[in-house]
Amino acid sequence: MARITVQDAVEKIGNRFDLVLVASQRAREMQIFGKSPMVDKENDKYTVIALREIEQGLIEKQ
């Protein structure tokens, strides 16, 4: 299981409410529309992958 520090992701986006919106949108893109993850999957769920992408600065608030 992945260890995600949500605080790091919040700092990248600005606040926790926007983080939820951005992460859920990205997870939806991967799950429904078949977009490729920008990080290794490591058997994680799409929401965890989205949070890892945000934490690494690969996804930004639009």
UniProtKB/Swiss-Prot annotation:
Extent of the signal sequence: none
Pfam families cross-referenced by the UniProt entry: RNA_pol_Rpb6
EC id: 2.7.7.6
Superkingdom per UniProt: Bacteria
Stored Gene3D superfamilies: 3.90.940.10
Keyword Nucleotidyltransferase: yes
Presence of the UniProt keyword Transferase in the record: yes
Transmembrane intervals: none
Family in the record: Belongs to the RNA polymerase subunit omega family.
Matches recorded under HAMAP family: RNApol_bact_RpoZ
Identification of the protein by name: DNA-directed RNA polymerase subunit omega
Organism: Wigglesworthia glossinidia brevipalpis
UniProt gene name: rpoZ
